[in-house]
């Protein structure tokens, strides 16, 4: 059953960091990878994570949660259920079966693209975009542009982890960006 505003207790997220495994030199030498699979397998940790995201957005009358491929698909449906909202996947090109809206964006060495079903968002629907990680902000920014091109009102963006030193938040200044856990290295 979806929660109601009065049923969300404050969640202290800092203990969740202990459930995230740090893997040095992955996927390449010099990178410290924050592996959330150890958090996902912990039923109380995963529940606390979803509760904390829900607590932040419960008062905002959200219509849709947009989950960015691929880990946004883990958190998005659970959050959508908790907020009594729908879930919409944002995918790489060629993965959705019906007519899609397409947005191409620049990467450091090339381009990438995202797609969403053209009928996924009705004009004026209130949307949250979720993913596991905010790093440089490029994919999140592209997702906001894709969603607003279909008429979405972006209420905010929610992330499990934010790598503060990569300054991805700067690309999303006009939005409420909420990250549960922050890392500065």
Residue ranges of model-derived segments:
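Active-site-facing substrate-recognition patch
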Residues: 2-62
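PRPP-dependent phosphoribosyltransferase catalytic core
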Residues: 2-8, 12, 18, 141-185
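Residue-level signature of catalytic and energy-coupling elements of molecular machines
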Residues: 30, 65, 87, 157
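Short glycine-rich phosphate-binding loop at a beta-alpha junction
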Residues: 62-69
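Conserved acidic residues
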Residues: 63, 125, 155
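Short Gly/Thr/Asp-enriched flexible loops that form oxyanion-binding sites at enzyme active sites
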Residues: 74-83
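Short, glycine/charge-rich flexible loops or terminal/linker lids adjacent to PRPP-binding catalytic cores
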Residues: 85-128
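Conserved G/P- and acidic residue-centered "switch" motifs that form tight phosphate/ATP-binding loops
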Residues: 132, 137
């Amino acid at each position: 059953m979806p929660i109601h505003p009065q049923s969300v207790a404050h969640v202290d997220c800092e203990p969740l960091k202990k459930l995230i495994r740090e893997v040095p030199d992955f996927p390449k030498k010099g990178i410290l990878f924050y592996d959330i699979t150890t958090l996902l397998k912990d039923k109380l940790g995963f529940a606390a994570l979803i509760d904390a995201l829900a607590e932040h957005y419960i008062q905002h009358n959200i219509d849709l949660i947009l989950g960015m491929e691929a880990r946004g698909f883990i958190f998005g449906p659970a959050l959508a259920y908790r907020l009594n909202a729908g879930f919409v996947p944002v995918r790489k090109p060629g993965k959705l079966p019906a007519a899609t809206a397409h947005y191409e964006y620049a990467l450091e060495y090339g381009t990438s693209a995202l797609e969403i079903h053209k009928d996924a968002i009705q004009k004026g629907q209130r949307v949250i975009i979720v993913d596991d990680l905010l790093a440089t902000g490029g994919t999140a920014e592209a997702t906001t542009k894709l969603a607003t091109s279909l008429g979405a009102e972006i209420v905010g963006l929610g992330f499990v982890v934010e790598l503060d030193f990569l300054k991805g938040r700067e690309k999303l200044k006009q939005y409420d960006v909420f990250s549960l856990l922050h890392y500065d290295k």
